[in-house]
C-alpha cells in the first residue's frame, strides 16, 4: 500500500521549512541539571493552516522536537500506568486505550516515513474501540482523507526566567487521596469529556505518583479545590491539563497555578500546547510559539 492509498501524505511546505532552517543554538542547553509527559482514500490537499499562524524562527525546529519528546514521555507514562498497549516507532507513538480513552497517535518527527504513514492509517482505519486523536506537532502530515477533522493549536515554550510567587495556595500532590481530587478537577473542569462520568483512577492511576518526572499540583481557594495540573520533566518540562473549575474562574487560579509550575520547574524550559482562552496568560509570562500543531480527531 502506498502512502496515498493509505490516506496520508506528507506536506512539503511545513516540513521543508523545518529542514531548510539551520537550528539556533539554545542558550539553556548547557545547564547540567536537566532531568528526564476510516477508511483509506487518496489525499492530495495540503493540511489546514490557520491564517494567523506565526512564522517560525531559527531554532524553533529544535525546540519543537523537545516539546514533542516531552509529549511522548507523557503518553508513555499514561499508557504504562493505565496498562494500555503502546506501539513505538522512530516516527510515531501510538497508545491503544479502551473504549473511553480511545486511540492516541503522536507523530515524533516532521518527516515520517512512508511505512510510518501506512501503519498510522491502518491503526486509524481498524480502530473500533472509541475516539481517535492523531497529534502532529509539526503540521506536516495530511490526514484530510482519513475521516478525521483537524484543528490547529500553538506549541509554546518558555526559557528559564524568574516568576512571581503564586497568589493562592498551590501544593504538590503526593498521596492517592489528593491525586483523586486532582483527577476530579481535571476530568470535570478541563473537561475530559471522554472520561465522563468520572471513574476514580481512570485518568490518573495512583502509579503515576511513583513515575519519575511526573508531578501534580493542586490549587485551593479558602481550602476548597479550585484548579489543578500535571507536569512532566524530560529533556524539558511540559505542562498539561491546567484546569480551573468553572465556579472559580476569573479569580486568578490559572495564573497562580502557572506561577507555581514555573517556580517548581525553575532552571528548565517549559513547553505547552495553548488553547485560545489560555494564550493571553501564557504570552504574559514569556511563552512564545515554536510551531502550530495539527490535531486530527
Regions found by a protein language model. Give the residues of each.
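A short, well-structured alpha-helix characteristic of acyl/acetyltransferase catalytic modules
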Residues: 175-189
Amino acid at each position: 500500500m502506498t502512502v496515498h492509498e493509505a490516506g496520508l501524505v506528507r506536506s512539503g511546505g511545513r516540513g521543508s521549512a523545518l529542514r531548510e532552517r539551520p537550528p539556533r543554538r539554545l542558550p539553556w542547553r548547557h545547564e547540567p541539571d536537566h532531568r528526564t509527559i476510516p477508511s483509506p482514500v487518496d489525499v492530495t490537499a495540503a493540511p489546514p493552516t490557520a491564517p494567523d499562524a506565526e512564522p517560525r524562527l531559527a531554532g524553533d525546529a529544535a525546540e519543537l522536537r523537545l516539546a514533542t519528546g516531552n509529549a511522548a514521555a507523557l503518553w508513555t507514562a499514561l499508557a504504562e500506568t493505565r496498562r494500555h498497549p503502546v506501539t513505538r516507532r522512530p516516527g510515531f507513538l501510538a497508545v491503544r486505550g479502551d473504549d473511553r480513552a480511545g486511540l492516541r497517535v503522536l507523530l515524533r518527527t516532521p518527516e515520517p516515513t512512508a511505512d510510518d504513514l501506512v501503519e498510522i492509517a491502518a491503526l486509524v482505519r481498524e480502530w473500533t474501540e472509541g475516539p481517535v486523536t492523531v497529534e502532529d506537532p509539526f503540521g506536516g502530515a495530511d490526514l484530510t482523507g482519513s475521516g478525521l477533522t483537524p484543528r490547529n493549536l500553538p506549541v509554546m515554550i518558555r526559557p528559564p526566567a524568574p516568576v512571581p510567587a503564586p497568589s493562592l495556595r498551590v501544593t504538590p500532590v503526593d498521596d492517592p487521596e489528593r491525586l483523586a481530587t486532582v483527577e476530579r478537577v481535571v476530568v470535570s473542569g478541563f473537561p475530559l469529556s471522554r472520561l465522563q462520568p468520572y471513574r476514580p483512577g481512570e485518568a490518573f492511576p495512583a502509579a503515576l505518583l511513583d513515575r519519575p518526572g511526573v508531578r501534580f499540583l493542586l490549587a485551593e481557594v479558602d481550602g476548597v479545590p479550585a484548579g489543578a495540573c500535571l507536569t512532566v520533566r524530560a529533556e524539558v518540562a511540559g505542562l498539561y491539563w491546567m484546569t480551573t473549575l468553572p465556579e472559580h474562574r476569573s479569580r486568578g487560579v490559572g495564573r497562580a497555578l502557572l506561577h507555581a509550575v514555573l517556580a517548581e520547574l525553575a532552571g528548565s524550559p517549559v513547553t505547552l500546547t495553548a488553547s485560545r482562552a489560555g494564550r493571553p496568560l501564557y504570552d504574559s509570562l514569556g511563552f512564545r510559539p515554536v510551531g502550530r500543531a495539527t490535531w486530527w480527531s
